Amino acid sequence: MHCPFCSATDTKVIDSRLVADGHQVRRRRECAECHERFTTFEGAELVMPRVVKQDGSRQPFDEEKLRGGMLRAVEKRPVSMDQIEQALTKIKSTLRATGEREVKSEMIGNLMMDQLVNLDKVAYIRFASVYRAFEDVSEFGDAIAKLQK
């Protein structure tokens, strides 16, 4: 680690603590040359996989698109923002845990439905009707029947 004061490369760690719910490490360092102290924060760089669309095109994972889809599904439903954020975090964690560089958009849609079915059944049906492109009322009935099992 370079000293921000004198650019020396010889620094030592004086103190280390976990911060941000254990997702970061705060370190107090001291420069061996000028003896100035400074703080650094370290965190894991978690890279989301790229999304392979149904047409074969690839694009970066877009958390806002995921959030927007969930917000549309739960609109005017008794689901809190905390519940939504927890569901989104679970989806992102599952995607990272695959260890893959690319995931199919279908997998993301299925993960979204898995979370919605636990949050709110109506929101699940709303999302499924768009995601699965329901053509008529019987498809809604089939989806509702599966929920009631």
From Swiss-Prot:
Cofactor binding: number and manner: Binds 1 zinc ion.
Family recorded in the similarity comment: Belongs to the NrdR family.
Function: Negatively regulates transcription of bacterial ribonucleotide reductase nrd genes and operons by binding to NrdR-boxes.
Entry annotated with the keyword Magnesium: no
Any one GO molecular-function label of the UniProt entry: ATP binding
Zinc finger (unnamed) boundaries: 3-34
Keywords, sorted A to Z: ATP-binding, DNA-binding, Metal-binding, Nucleotide-binding, Repressor, Transcription, Transcription regulation, Zinc, Zinc-finger
Gene: nrdR
Pfam families reported in the protein's UniProt record: ATP-cone (PF03477), Zn_ribbon_NrdR (PF22811)
Protein's name according to its UniProt entry: Transcriptional repressor NrdR
ATP-cone domain residues: 49-139
